[in-house]
From Swiss-Prot:
It is an enzyme of class 2 (transferase). Residues 328-349 are annotated as: Disordered. Pfam families: Methyltransf_5 (PF01795). PANTHER family: 12S RRNA N4-METHYLCYTIDINE METHYLTRANSFERASE, S-ADENOSYL-METHYLTRANSFERASE MRAW. It comes from Dehalococcoides mccartyi (strain ATCC BAA-2100 / JCM 16839 / KCTC 5957 / BAV1). The gene is rsmH. This is Ribosomal RNA small subunit methyltransferase H. Keywords: Cytoplasm, Methyltransferase, rRNA processing, S-adenosyl-L-methionine, Transferase.
Amino acid sequence: MIEYPHIPVMLEESIQGLGVIPGGRYVDCTLGAGGHSEAILEHSYPGGQLLSIDADPSAITLAAERLKSFGSSVLLVNDNFANLKDICQRYEYMPVHGILFDLGLSSMQLDRQESGFSFQTEAPLDMRFSPEQELTAADIINGYDVTELSDLIWKYGEEPFSRRIARAIAEKRPFKTTTELAAAIERAVGGRHGRIHPATRTFQALRIAVNEELSHLESALSQAHSLLGHGGRLVVISYHSLEDRIVKQYFQKEAKGCICPDDIPQCVCDHQPSLRIINRRVITPSDEEISRNPRSRSAKMRVAERIIEPGEGRFFSSREDELVNHVSRTGSVQHGQAKHKGVVQRGGS
């Protein structure tokens, strides 16, 4: 039996949040090692379909082996989820019953030394999700001026010592490795302040900037929303406050009617609710899961459901609506096992 390097976070909660039904059509925007994808395929059997996306080609290779028994029920696409709508249109894969985002780094990305995501071991300052991207962490560290560096570390890392760190980097550069940079940051702030390493927030900021994570998330949420059929579910797992804030604010905006500024006496926006927030309070991992998988401790899950706007037609048949509504009421699905041959893989365009 093959052991996979990444443990899927809040797996049961993800399946319940998506309301997976037999014969449903789903998208996993963050394939990783394929743990969530595998569970979606099992629970949507018989007749379920899954499109799984990852910018990292090594994730596609690993997951293809894991999911090969599901055959043509799953389509693996090497692309960025910022291109979600184009991908679904390309493969005529719309509308869908549910879309999952499990944001942040997978364990295998953290543990892959050459990617430079971790400062625990010496590695080049890379931090790209895909080797096709041009900008690296080294480009930022060695090329940005002090003000640009300080602003970036504050904006994406919420680092209170951002100015001090930026000045120290400018004085000591060029930097080539993760350990060199982490040591310089630790010296700049005078050692640890709290339970996390002094370089943690700066490394987060660099990774977000290199991969344009926040702008891609904002774009992908809107695209995902438009791909959902009536009753379709959008599930997002985030790992830091910047991501969670974007998801929370998007869900709140789309779940209410008028979004005109408060100083306008009469509505002129004509905005209608198109999402229903399923969990008013954020869902977090259980103590048992955190003890089993410490990397899940910062995870937060939010779930929303697509509702029909006035004048909009239904995407799914009445039978599919019944299945979605049943899952919405009961929160349960039947577990099935699918056995097929030959996973379909596609590269990005």
